[in-house]
């Protein structure tokens, strides 16, 4: 078949999108606005335990949305404890009901799935619950869950297939372990849980499971939160340990065995040290794997049409306009090589791509200074460079790190967690002390970080922060009064909420 410019009227669709997650749906709705004929193919391959879900991708079904709701469940448990100090008479034995939480979370997700279906229908986007595979230039095969196949053609294609959790490849992992894909709809309380991994998924799940009263252990191969600021990562780990989450460091599981079937059952985990011959064993009700995620790019026929991928990671290299090496095929989201794996990034990239393709826009997605939040018990918000990356980029002598602990006023009456919340900015002294890294550990870190992210985009400097009057008494005001540098070695401990 010839190129898209030769036979425009011969295609079934202007754009076929493989993947109905946040990025794919954003691109579909945007393209449809410009009168284009668009199809979305979305298919969820069940997990080894058989878990599947509806339209909307990872974020809505098994990611950000259920994760934040369960984090909120844990925060409410803490709020109940705090409330006694504020005069509320709360029963001593407050219990958490797993089934009720799961039902509420799944009902909300179901309403979102339905909302996406309706939105596509209203915009006249054709949606098929089918697995898409390239079978030749401009052609794709769609296979539904009954095995029925259809062939479609399109002028352009967008790959937005996302990622799925990785397994260990050891005896018993797929038979007996769960992943985050299973956790948010788990029909029984997981009980005593081992979480394997040190990713943000691992630590967030550990945090909210412990927060609702479960016995939680995290098994870590090396460092926490690889790729994030390690100063912040270590503070998160310390706080979690102080709040009863156990860490087994420098061990990896080599075998998982079932001792007793049930919901939950009992499992034996055998693990080996990463730096010696030492072997340890432990018994748990549930083992949750959170060791990373792999791009869903290897079984969609990319080799048939010549799309290059990184053979090691499965990631797709693209131009700054999200174009693959095959001109009529584009890619967005978590499957891109060397790009940030976050829902809002995929949404932005999808919308802007459709605007460039169909509305004459030239605006490209900006992958720099993307804000993010890790919803651990002590939330971590970040924007810009980690301290390690700033040193690597500018040299240690050319950066100044301002930092301070702070104590949220609301925590002073329950008298908890003083000198645990932490604020840090990293400035480039060769560029007017421009803020190149923003980091905050504390309640509502995402809400705090979002506004500062806009300021960083505008070229925020330390002088501008200093001349900004803070709102009192809130956590974010600490950023208007940062005066102690790391280099000075001076104390940053706080005696009260107002420093």
Curated annotation (Swiss-Prot):
GO terms of biological process kind: cell population proliferation; cell redox homeostasis; cellular response to oxidative stress; glutathione metabolic process; mesoderm formation
GO MF annotation list: FAD binding; glutathione-disulfide reductase (NADPH) activity; identical protein binding; NADPH peroxidase activity; thioredoxin-disulfide reductase (NADPH) activity
Listed cofactors: FAD
Residues annotated for FAD binding in this entry: 22-23, 42-43, 58-59, 63-67, 131-132, 161, 200, 334, 341-343, 472
Its job: Reduces disulfideprotein thioredoxin (Trx) to its dithiol-containing form. Homodimeric flavoprotein involved in the regulation of cellular redox reactions, growth and differentiation. Contains a selenocysteine residue at the C-terminal active site that is essential for catalysis. Also has reductase activity on hydrogen peroxide (H2O2).
PANTHER family referenced in this protein's UniProt entry, alphabetically: GLUTATHIONE REDUCTASE (PTHR42737), THIOREDOXIN-DISULFIDE REDUCTASE (PTHR42737:SF8)
Listed name of the protein: Thioredoxin reductase 1, cytoplasmic
Native source organism of the sequence: Pongo abelii
